[in-house]
Design a protein with these regions (language model features):
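Membrane-water interface segments at transmembrane-helix boundaries in multipass membrane proteins
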Residues: 83, 132-194, 312
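Membrane-interfacial helix-loop-helix junctions in multi-pass membrane proteins
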Residues: 52-61, 76-86, 168, 180, ...
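Hydrophobic alpha-helical transmembrane segments of membrane transport/permease proteins
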Residues: 15-65, 158-175
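Membrane-topology segments of multi-pass transport proteins
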Residues: 35-81, 308-331
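Cytoplasmic-entry segments and transmembrane alpha-helices of multi-pass inner-membrane transporters
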Residues: 2-11, 111-150
Length: 331
């Protein structure tokens, strides 16, 4: 298990290099740079000095090498737009993104999994058909459109919730969480239903029913446990994306999270902030995916046994190799 985690961490290195280089190249191709945005705050001499310091008088490859060298030393750089270290900016915005991600995922799980189970156990019924139509609608609605509709109806129309910011506590969180959670809820409902149907129709559950095991026990104790892996995969994927920053939703609701910080930095050609935010988002997504993979082993005993047998086989092969080398040396 330890070797598996180590390999996954190593796999993150080329991903970070590739993503950061792509960001540098794309922003370099765009007209203007961060110096154009801050020119009014400096004299021409200071701007020339700053241009040399930031490497804008050299190639994008040189600037990228400078950035990666600083990154290796744990420095995400300094934003000349916000006049603060990128790490501080990221940490300042992260709690808002965590609140939004946690609320949307939690509500989605609490609603969609029971709905998916009900749809599967009542396959072909009115409940099943209505839930699938609702899930299809949830998948079809773009986040920006849904967010705007919620603002028009519940904020501007009824005045129940604030339309922007996070100053009103949980009231400010409700509309953004619904916007982010709707797509996840739809996906999770369909996944739960599909996975449960596959398990419910399996032979071993038919055997359990034939032995007189109550249907509730069959569903809760046997079917749900064996249907969890696809469900966990969807939850982990969506959680990772949300932690990376719900860019569209955060901008629609002026939510002060990582996604909005990234968009603001893009508009102002703040390459350092954009790169730092995206690198941290990639790390967050990768960590969540790693946790999902490790969760599989706890949910499914077969995978746990596979990890154990894989480790034993490698140890046995290494021991056999050493024994062979010792035998050759003795000869």
């Amino acid at each position: 298990m330890g070797k598996y985690i180590f390999k996954r961490v190593l796999m993150l290195i080329p991903v970070i290099i590739g993503v950061s280089f792509l960001i540098f190249v794309l922003l370099d191709l765009a007209p203007g740079n961060v110096l154009d945005m801050i020119a009014g705050d400096y004299t021409p001499e200071q701007l020339a000095e700053l241009e040399h310091e930031l490497g804008y008088d050299r190639s994008v490859f040189y600037r990228y090498a400078m950035y990666m060298w600083d990154l290796l030393h744990g420095d995400l750089g300094t934003s000349y737009i916000y006049k603060a270290p990128v790490w501080d900016l990221y940490i300042q915005r992260l709690p808002s993104t965590l609140k939004l991600a946690g609320a949307s995922v939690l509500v989605s799980i609490l609603l969609s999994i029971p709905l998916g189970i009900t749809a599967a156990t009542k396959h072909g019924s009115l409940t099943d058909n209505v839930s699938m139509v609702a899930a299809l609608l949830g998948l079809s609605m773009p986040n920006f459109w849904l967010g705007l509709m919620l603002i028009i109806i519940f904020s501007q129309g009824l005045g129940w919730f604030p339309s922007s910011g996070d100053k009103d506590g949980i009231l400010s969180l409700i509309l953004p969480a619904i916007t982010v959670g709707t797509g996840l809820m739809a996906t999770l409902t369909r996944t739960t239903r599909s996975s449960m149907l596959d398990v419910i129709r399996s032979d071993y559950l038919r055997t359990a029913r034939s032995k007189g095991v109550p249907e509730k026990t069959v569903v809760k104790k046997h079917a749900l446990k064996n249907a969890l892996i696809p469900i966990i995969t969807v939850i982990g994927t969506q959680m990772g994306r949300t932690l990376g920053g719900s860019v569209v939703t955060e901008n629609v609701f002026s939510w002060p999270g990582v996604g909005r910080l990234t968009i603001e930095a893009v508009k102002q050609r703040d390459t350092t902030t954009v790169t730092g935010c995206i690198i941290m988002s990639v790390i967050m997504i990768s960590v969540v995916q790693l946790l999902v993979d490790l969760t599989y082993a706890f949910v499914d005993p077969r995978l746990r046994a596979q990890y154990a047998s894989s480790g034993k086989k490698k140890k046995a092969a290494a021991a056999a190799k050493k024994a062979g080398e010792a035998e050759k040396g003795g000869v």
